[in-house]
Amino acid sequence: MVERLLESSASWSNFFIFFGLAVLLLFAVLGFVTYGILAERKVMGFMQGRVGPNQVGGRFGLLQTVADVLKLLLKEDSIPKAADKPLFILAPIIAFAPAFMVLAVIPFTSQFQFADIGVGLLYYIAISGITTIGVLTGGWASNNKYSLLGGMRAAAQMISYEIPLVMSVIGIVLLTGSLNLNEIVASQEKVWYIFAQPIGFIIFLIAAVAELNRTPFDLPEAESELVSGYHTEYSGFRWAFFMLAEYVYLFGMASLMTVLFLGGWNPVLFLDFIPGAVWFALKFSAVVFLFIWFRVTFPRMRGDQLMEFGWKVLLPIALANIFLTALIKELFF
């Protein structure tokens, strides 16, 4: 359906159809964020020997996050007197908008994708980098030393780990010969790239956790050091925008990892009677669970350890993986 709309001439009817689909995707992502946070709290509770949310919405706390969202919307929206007001207001929007934009190129099934462009992988990497500007702007505009430190940490971390993240997928591009995400999924019909590119997968996984600012790489928001990091001065729905961006990126990064390394909607052998959407959802859920598991398990790294690990360990291994992949392809394919 989307492909037919893209091929048709521009019209108001097509505009409203695309707008409706975008709103539908937005609500689907917001639903994931709402219950993804709840799932994370329940899983963390289980791993730490606690119950987790169990009061609002029954014994499983099904409405706990809904209540939290309502609380955030009703909280006072305060702007510090010394803050740069225009930038302070604009920063959460700059941080959130790219998080939603990157979802346009991710193919969730063979039929469901908003924009099947030839350089979908490059588009995702390029657009996701804009969020760094929003985070740094928020830290600067707050006129608070903790916010500024958090923003500078976030910028340094995201730039440092985006390089090995990009390097880790070059092996896949070499094997596939394309930056199109649909073609990457199609090339994994027989063998998933988690088996063909195990080194690339490990590098991508570690760099993805760092890009998401999640434990053990959550230095920009380190509560014990920086109060709340770059969004210390934010409250209410503006603070919610930053949190929303973080969890929408979790949705996007888990989806991208599913597409790049786990075969997307391709089924496991002899189980092709199960719909592709179900396979995508199962693989996606496994990746999200892995991110949550990391958060519960690992302690926070020091800043110097973080930078040293990115530049001195991940980057050389990623470069070696590119060389090895090119050599194997030249010799055996």
Swiss-Prot record:
Keywords: Cell membrane, Membrane, NAD, Quinone, Translocase, Transmembrane, Transmembrane helix, Ubiquinone. This is NADH-quinone oxidoreductase subunit H. NDH-1 is composed of 14 different subunits. Subunits NuoA, H, J, K, L, M, N constitute the membrane sector of the complex. One of its GO terms (cellular component) is plasma membrane. It is found in: Cell membrane. It holds the Pfam family NADHdh. NDH-1 shuttles electrons from NADH, via FMN and iron-sulfur (Fe-S) centers, to quinones in the respiratory chain. The immediate electron acceptor for the enzyme in this species is believed to be ubiquinone. Couples the redox reaction to proton translocation (for every two electrons transferred, four hydrogen ions are translocated across the cytoplasmic membrane), and thus conserves the redox energy in a proton gradient. This subunit may bind ubiquinone. Coiled coil: none annotated. Its EC number is 7.1.1.-. It is a multi-pass membrane protein. InterPro entries: NADH_UbQ_OxRdtase_su1/FPO, NADH_UbQ_OxRdtase_su1_CS.
